[in-house]
């Protein structure tokens, strides 16, 4: 995980990457207006949840993807937004990758790995990714995720958009082996 990714995107780096790909001065001007319309600190930050921010994030982190695949030559790598994992049979290799990744992020993209979210674990303990624990034959929602879902639903109970929230969480749980939890949520909140 990258520490405060959306708040830390460097405008100069992002614009430089866009200029490599886009030749139209008009489009570049428009994108520059969008980028400079939001700042968390001088010259940094893109708004969380904005459609353009999702595109900008993928363009920005494509540099990370290329570094991981072509320079580090990590065979098993997966990224979704600013969350990513890579796998190796060798713990020493993982530690070396992390060290090189930190340097690349700081020097090239002006980003920082979140120190509390670096996690080295055995594959048979599952992969903790995007709120799920992914195991060889099944996927579970993370305990913290289950607690957060329950808390959010209790907060929204009786609100106008409660059913939408419940349906959204049930949709999220469909990607996991969480039949019992889904059934319990329906029974508890819909009765």
Positions of PLM-derived features:
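Right-hand nucleic-acid polymerase module
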Residues: 37, 92-99, 113-191
């Amino acid at each position: 995980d990258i520490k405060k990714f959306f708040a830390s995107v460097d405008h100069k780096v992002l614009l430089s990457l866009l200029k490599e790909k886009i030749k139209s001065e008009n489009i570049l001007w428009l994108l520059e207006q969008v980028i400079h319309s939001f700042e968390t600190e001088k010259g940094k930050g893109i708004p969380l949840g904005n459609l353009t921010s999702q595109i900008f994030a993928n363009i920005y982190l494509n540099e990370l993807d290329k570094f991981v695949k072509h320079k580090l030559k990590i065979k098993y790598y997966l990224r979704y937004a600013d969350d990513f994992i890579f796998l190796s049979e060798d713990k020493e290799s993982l530690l070396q990758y992390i060290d090189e990744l930190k340097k690349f992020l700081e020097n090239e993209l002006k980003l920082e790995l979140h120190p509390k979210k670096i996690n080295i674990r055995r594959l048979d303990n599952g992969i903790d990714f995007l709120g799920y624990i992914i195991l060889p034959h099944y996927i579970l929602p993370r305990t913290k995720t289950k607690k957060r879902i329950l808390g959010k639903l209790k907060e929204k109970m009786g609100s106008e958009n409660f059913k939408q929230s419940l349906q959204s969480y049930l949709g999220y749980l469909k990607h996991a082996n969480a039949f019992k939890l889904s059934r319990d949520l329906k029974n508890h909140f819909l009765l």
